[in-house]
């Protein structure tokens, strides 16, 4: 089956191989663009990189800050970038060219893709995005990506900002200082920043109209304010064969369909987790042996007393 992809060309005279681009082929993370193949022989002048299509996405620098980047949206985007940076750190990958034009947002689902990793000999970064150690000695580390990330956050707050304003909310102010610390030992890594109050205290976001309601089990759960609302299950996929089966046991096949846990309030308003949950296989093929991963929900201030009620999204075979 053919895969829709984009093509990136890099002039061979400016191509810094060192196997870095081949490491990228092995990365598999929802917020990092997939690199399908690299062809160094097809063109005499260019290295050809075949990568995941980003149709429907918009780079951060193309957005109108006032109309899109609310505090809630900024926190959600920051968390997704940090999750990707933590993953890269664990795989010893440094982006080297992280800036607003290299973070793509898909507005309908509020998800992101980090693109255009720096695999060239020349550093094209705007100096604002370059950490002090990069400017001084061209020394790139995972913490130089954190500095670049800090400037992305500044630009989401206000495109005109080049320094941290004093009038920011306390959590955001402290978070930015932790990203833009001149001293490397004071600059926090992605793992630590993910536990900063600016991230862990972010609210749940409103349901995207692009999602489709595929099930509404009559089950109640509690929000942190102790009011009860209806659990709903949503997806932005289109497969009609997937459904929630509560009572029957049968052979099933797990799909890669994205699932979102949602809340329907009495007035009809719907809230949803901004990122998909995961299905975990516990044992066998019994529908009752599947539960939804709770770790994706913990940051959204939602408590599920009996999450195993969602046994599975399944397809009969």
From Swiss-Prot:
What is recorded about the protein's domains? The protein kinase domain is predicted to be catalytically inactive.
GO MF terms, alphabetically ordered: ATP binding; protein serine/threonine kinase activity
Domain (Protein kinase): residue spans on this chain: 1-199
The transmembrane residues are none
* A Pfam family assignment: Pkinase
Q: Could you give one GO CC term from the UniProt record?
A: cytoplasm
Look up the domain of life of the source: Eukaryota
Per the UniProt record, the lineage of the source organism begins with: Eukaryota, Amoebozoa, Evosea, Eumycetozoa, Dictyostelia
Q: Which InterPro entries would you find in this protein's record?
A: Kinase-like_dom_sf, Prot_kinase_dom
**Native source organism of the sequence:** Dictyostelium discoideum (Social amoeba)
> Which family is annotated?
Belongs to the protein kinase superfamily. Ser/Thr protein kinase family.
Q: This protein is called what?
A: Probable inactive serine/threonine-protein kinase DDB_G0268656
Q: Which GO terms describe its biological process?
A: intracellular signal transduction
């Amino acid at each position: 089956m053919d895969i829709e992809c984009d093509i990136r060309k890099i002039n061979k005279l400016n191509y810094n191989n060192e196997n870095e681009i081949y490491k990228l082929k092995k990365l598999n993370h929802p917020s990092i663009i997939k690199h399908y193949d690299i062809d160094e022989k097809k063109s005499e002048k260019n290295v050809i990189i075949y990568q995941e299509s980003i149709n429907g996405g918009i780079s951060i620098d193309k957005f109108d800050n006032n109309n899109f980047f609310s505090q809630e949206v900024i926190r959600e985007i920051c968390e997704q970038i940090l999750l990707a940076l933590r993953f890269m750190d664990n795989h010893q990958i440094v982006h080297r060219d992280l800036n607003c034009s290299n973070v793509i947002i898909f507005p309908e689902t509020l998800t992101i893709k980090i693109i255009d990793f720096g695999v060239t000999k020349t550093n094209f970064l705007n100096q604002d995005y370059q950490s002090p150690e990069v400017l001084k000695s061209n020394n790139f580390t995972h913490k130089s990506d954190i500095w670049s990330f800090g400037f992305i956050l500044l630009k989401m707050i206000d495109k005109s900002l080049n320094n941290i304003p004093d009038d920011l909310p306390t959590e955001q102010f402290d978070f930015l200082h932790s990203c833009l610390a001149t001293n490397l030992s004071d600059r926090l890594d992605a793992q630590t920043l993910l536990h900063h109050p600016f991230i862990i205290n972010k609210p749940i976001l409103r349901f995207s109209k692009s999602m489709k309601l595929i099930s509404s089990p009559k089950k109640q759960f509690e929000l942190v304010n102790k009011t009860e609302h209806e659990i709903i299950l949503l997806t932005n996929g289109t497969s009609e064969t997937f459904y929630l089966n509560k009572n029957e046991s049968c052979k099933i096949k797990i799909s890669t369909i994205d699932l979102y846990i949602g809340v329907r309030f009495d007035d009809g308003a719907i809230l949803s987790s901004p990122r998909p949950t995961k299905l975990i296989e516990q044992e066998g093929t019994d529908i009752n042996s599947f539960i939804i991963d709770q770790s994706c929900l913990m940051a959204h201030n939602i408590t599920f007393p009996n999450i195993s009620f969602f046994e599975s999204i399944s397809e009969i075979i």
